[in-house]
Amino acid sequence: MRCPKCSSEESKVVDSRQAEDAIRRRRVCESCGFRFTTFERIEEMPLLVIKKDDKREPFNREKIVRGLVRSAYKRPVSSEDIETTVANVERKIRQLDSNEVESDVIGEFVMQELAELDDITYIRFASVYRSFKDVSELEELLKNITKK
């Protein structure tokens, strides 16, 4: 690791600790004695979302957050609940072992999480996500919820 003070390539690790999503390493330059900290993180592959029209765009977790905030409006769903839901969805996506995922799959993951969180938020999200054509489709969803 190059020393930020003298640019020497010779340094040694004097301490390693687990940080949130990285390994924190305390280093000492063997040339000038300067102490510095580095972080080692896993490089995650960028996720691409395959839209209904087959276009691909980078995964944007904020889109999920916005959709959930809209669906949870005036509901007893905290911002922490929303953040946890999004984190769970992103974890499920990354477990697919692919750097491309269809938007439908993301929507289904969100629906699975919302079904456990709040029924009204689930219905609101589903009504937009599934684009119900008539009331009978909504009634079918409601029947499935009341069976729980």
From Swiss-Prot:
One of its GO terms (biological process) is negative regulation of DNA-templated transcription. GO terms for molecular function: ATP binding; DNA binding; zinc ion binding. Binds 1 zinc ion. It holds the Pfam family ATP-cone. Keywords: ATP-binding, DNA-binding, Metal-binding, Nucleotide-binding, Repressor, Transcription, Transcription regulation, Zinc, Zinc-finger. Its cofactor is Zn(2+). A zinc finger (unnamed) spans 3-32. Residues 47-137 form the ATP-cone domain. The keyword Magnesium does not apply. It comes from the Bacteria. PANTHER family: TRANSCRIPTIONAL REPRESSOR NRDR. Negatively regulates transcription of bacterial ribonucleotide reductase nrd genes and operons by binding to NrdR-boxes. Belongs to the NrdR family. This is Transcriptional repressor NrdR.
